[in-house]
């Protein structure tokens, strides 16, 4: 078993951070077809003694505790798309809804059927793009997705409408990356108000599919104030020298590194 992305946040509402690790499954013989069997996500919840308790059983999997059948969570994000004030989880293209005490159930719309339709995303983000109090759901597809003929888009935003009826949210297509359709790997994404207009923008750490993981590129997506994301990389981050031959694996973070009031 192995994990790739962590979410650290207060899941059980006790004021202390907890830890979620999304499962990328259990590697098995390729003779089984998938090469990956389900394996449970990992959840550590803080207790009154200030210690962590292994609480993975708190996550519904519809598979007798053996792990969700989506198998491969290359992604994981925490946020509040249902607007109830606690931290939900989005991993493996399934939304895990928190009851406020650190127990997670699978959302009735963003469930295994949704995963089968859109497959496992390579990267994802929960962020309130239109300032309506509900975190929107953003995800980028793998370049080698099995359903490319039916799903040629590189990624989507599920844009909230001021309600928690996610099945009614508008689905917008994300701008493609610089290396071409089905040739771009969207490793990691982060949000922040880059242009100080009061709306969250997004940056994406990107690399090539071929040559494999060759080049490290940062895509800058600017929010228009209504939740639409426009690719303004060419104007805002020019001369990316590492985009040619730097190793493309890595994370991306948005912070004010030099304390000048502007996000880096």
Regions found by a protein language model. Give the residues of each.
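Residue-level signal for WD-repeat beta-propeller blades
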Residues: 13, 37, 46, 70, ...
């Amino acid at each position: 078993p192995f994990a790739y992305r962590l979410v650290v946040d207060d899941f059980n509402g006790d004021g202390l951070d907890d830890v979620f690790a999304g499962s990328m499954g259990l590697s098995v013989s390729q003779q089984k077809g998938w090469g990956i069997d389900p394996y449970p996500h990992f959840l550590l919840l803080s207790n009154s003694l200030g210690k962590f308790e292994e609480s993975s059983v708190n996550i519904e999997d519809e598979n007798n505790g053996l792990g969700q059948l989506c198998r491969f969570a290359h992604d994981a994000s925490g946020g509040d798309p249902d607007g109830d004030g606690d931290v939900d989880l989005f991993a493996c293209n399934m939304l895990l809804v928190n009851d406020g005490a650190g127990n997670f159930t699978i959302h009735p719309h963003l469930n295994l059927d949704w995963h089968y339709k859109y497959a496992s995303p390579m990267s994802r983000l929960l962020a309130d793009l239109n300032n309506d109090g509900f975190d929107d759901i953003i995800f980028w597809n793998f370049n080698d997705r099995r359903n490319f003929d039916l799903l040629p888009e590189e990624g989507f935003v599920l844009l909230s409408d001021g309600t928690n009826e996610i099945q009614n949210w508008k689905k917008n297509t994300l701008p493609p990356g610089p290396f071409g359709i089905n040739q771009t790997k969207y490793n990691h994404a982060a949000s922040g108000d880059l242009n100080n207009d009061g709306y969250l923008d997004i940056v994406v750490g990107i690399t090539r599919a071929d040559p494999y993981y060759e080049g490290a590129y940062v895509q800058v997506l600017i929010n228009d104030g209504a939740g639409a994301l426009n690719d303004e990389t060419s104007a805002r981050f020019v001369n990316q020298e590492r985009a040619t031959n730097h190793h493309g694996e890595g994370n991306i973070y948005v912070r004010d590194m030099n304390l000048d009031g502007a996000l880096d």
